[in-house]
Design a protein with these regions (language model features):
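Extracytoplasmic beta-strand-rich oligomerization domains located immediately C-terminal to a leader/signal peptide
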Residues: 1-50, 59, 140
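Short linear sequence signals and composition-biased patches located at protein termini or domain-edge surfaces
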Residues: 42-145
Length: 145
């Protein structure tokens, strides 16, 4: 069978604000897919496999992206593990993705609070954009750490 590695990266958005001509304060999430050739991960640029690719943008206008490692007792692991041995203690990862609308949504400025997962890093906005938060839990048996 063929083994693939899927990687997600969060990078600064390249979208320019129409008024200021500066980059907007947001990020974009990119997805890459590599193939194991038996000894190394094959670079998508050198691969002949049509199923591999590099840095395909999957969502833009990302305002917040949080990954929280959880152990087998349901407790947040803080600080997050930095070694492979300690990463095996992670059983679930809670993922929060906060995105804003591309265009103005409200007629007038609205005061909004975006709540953070498990931290005191709530953000307040007072503008005309719609914001949504998506929260999922991923079990690490489905991921390679």
């Amino acid at each position: 069978y063929t083994t693939y590695k899927i990687t997600y990266e969060c990078k600064q958005s390249n979208i320019l604000d129409k008024k200021t001509k500066n980059k907007i304060s947001a990020f974009a999430i990119y997805k890459s897919k590599s193939k194991w050739d038996g000894s190394n991960w094959e670079s998508p640029t050198n691969s002949t496999d049509d199923l591999v690719y590099k840095d395909e943008m999957i969502v833009d206008y990302v305002q917040d992206f949080i990954l929280i490692p959880i152990d087998d007792k349901g407790k947040i692991i803080n600080p997050a593990p930095t070694t492979l041995a300690n990463s095996n203690k992670i059983k679930v990862i809670d993922i929060l993705l906060s995105v804003r609308s591309q265009n103005i949504f409200y007629k007038n400025n609205k005061s909004k609070t975006i709540y953070s997962l498990g931290k005191n890093a709530n953000k307040k906005f007072n503008d005309k954009f719609l914001r949504e938060q998506i929260v999922v839990s991923a079990h690490t048996r489905n991921m390679g750490l």
